A protein has these predicted regions:
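OB-fold and OB-like beta-barrel modules that bind single-stranded nucleic acids
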Residues: 262, 320, 339, 374-387
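Hydrophobic helix-and-loop "lid/oligomerization" segment in the mid-to-C-terminal part
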Residues: 44-276, 282, 296, 302, ...
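Short gly/pro/ser/thr-enriched loop/turn and capping motifs at secondary-structure boundaries
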Residues: 2-7, 13, 21-23, 227-230, ...
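OB-fold single-stranded nucleic acid-binding module
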Residues: 276-281, 376-402
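Beta-strand/loop nucleic-acid-binding surfaces
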Residues: 248, 356-372
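Single-stranded nucleic-acid-binding OB-fold domains
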Residues: 343-347, 367-371, 384-395
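Short alpha-helices
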Residues: 8-51, 60-67, 263
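Accessory interdomain/linker segments of ATP-dependent helicases and helicase-like nucleic-acid enzymes
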Residues: 298-362
């Protein structure tokens, strides 16, 4: 799903559905999808040459769980083809036929493979695998996914879980430092957010950029040291701004400012000389203004309207959770008015609520929100099942309220 540059590498073969002239129809494949289709094509060619029988060769559907995980974790657009890949992988997981490493990761995350859904892949398994590459060596995550030994898989999954806990701590510290820098008296508001700190960890800047983008709703770049004289940044954008196009414009307006960059509409990475950051930040801001004609952005909240009371239950929540939702194919978001009967902070940064609508009472949670709400609210929310002591109930996950 990454877009190639103007000049392609001098190679015998380039496999990228987004390169000019490629007729492969699914342009939103993650890297794992590209290699999966390449393996299918290779097997077909080996069958044609007689290396395998017409229906012989390796059973590649045995890899569908890994393909699903990679597709969701890479946050690619879930078009029809990607949803098919994820659906096949989830079905394999729910049947219990999954790689030992995935089974171990489900265990350390406290999730049940037989009820696997896209949320598990994107928010429970994916971050634990990625944590190794962010803070240490990605080979641990690869080894966990590829081992056939159940005991080794569990040992590695536990190590990945510990690394992920460390990642959360580092990310929280960096996020607080970034917010403090944004709130400094000399921090001029602009169309973008662009931050750098010499003490930040290179592997976590993308997560910090994502958090800042959500908070300020602007294209965001966060940088950390990447060598003696270089800094490397990771960016996250909003639907109104194509991030790679912005960086391409900066590179054309200021040819020596960016040493290298790549990415797509919603995310990108780049490298600068450390001494060039003060010049880059305003150039980035100016490029966004030039491409969009705007200096501020507001999120547009699209909902599916009010949910009839008869459908606000655990059964419907369970049906929704079994579907494939994600980037470009969001889960239903409902909009209703509630009375707030009780509210309290849990984990210091999440708001736990007891809500009332007519004769119905609901438990609800707003992740990452620590401000109290008025007695009456209009809330945009999603349904999810909550399992506690063997009892299944419906919980509302608040996305916006006021």
């Amino acid at each position: 799903h990454h877009l190639p540059g103007d000049t392609l590498p001098d190679a015998l073969a380039i496999v990228n559905p987004n390169q000019p002239g490629c007729g492969f129809p699914s342009k939103n494949l993650a890297g794992v999808g590209v290699i999966f289709y390449m393996m299918l094509a290779l097997r077909a060619e080996l069958r044609r040459r007689g290396v395998y029988a017409p229906d012989g060769g390796p059973r590649l559907d045995a890899l569908s769980d890994l393909v699903a995980l990679g597709t969701v974790a890479d946050v690619v657009k879930l078009d029809a083809n990607n949803r098919l890949l994820v659906t096949q992988g989830l079905q394999r997981m729910r049947s219990g036929r999954l790689q030992p490493g995935l089974r171990a990761l489900f265990a350390v995350a406290g999730r049940e493979p037989r009820a696997a859904n896209g949320f598990d892949l994107g928010f429970a398994l994916g971050p634990r695998i990625n944590a190794a590459g962010r803070l240490a060596d990605m080979s641990l995550g690869i080894a966990c996914l590829t081992t056939d030994d159940e005991a080794q898989a569990l040992e590695m999954a536990r190590e990945l879980d510990n690394i992920n806990r460390e990642r959360r701590t580092i990310e929280a510290e960096m996020r607080e430092q970034a917010l403090a820098a944004m709130e400094a008296p000399d921090a001029a508001p602009g169309a973008t957010v662009c931050v750098f700190d010499p003490g930040w960890h290179q592997g976590v800047v993308g997560l910090v950029a994502s958090r800042l983008k959500e908070k300020f709703w602007r294209p965001t770049l966060a940088f950390a040291p990447a060598g003696d004289d270089e800094i490397r940044g990771s960016g996250r954008s909003i639907p109104d701004v194509h991030l790679r196009d912005v960086l391409d414009l900066v590179s054309k307006r200021h040819p020596n400012l960016i040493r290298k960059f790549g990415g797509h509409a919603m995310a990108a990475g780049l490298t600068l000389g450390r001494q060039d950051f003060p010049a880059f930040a305003p150039a980035f801001d100016a490029a966004v203004r030039e491409l969009t004609g705007r200096d501020s952005f507001e999120p547009v909240i699209e909902t599916d309207g009010s949910l009839e009371s008869g459908y606000a239950n655990a059964e419907v929540a369970g049906l929704l959770q079994q579907q494939v939702w994600g980037a470009g194919f969001a889960a239903p978001l409902f909009l209703d008015e509630f009375v707030v009967r009780n509210q309290r902070l849990v984990g210091e940064k999440h708001l736990k609520l007891s809500l009332e609508r007519g004769q119905q009472r609901f438990d609800a949670i707003w992740f990452g929100h620590d401000q109290s709400l008025p007695e009456r609210i209009q809330a945009a929310y999603r349904l999810e099942q909550n399992v506690w002591n063997g009892m299944v109930s419906v919980q509302l996950v608040i996305e916006h309220a006021g």
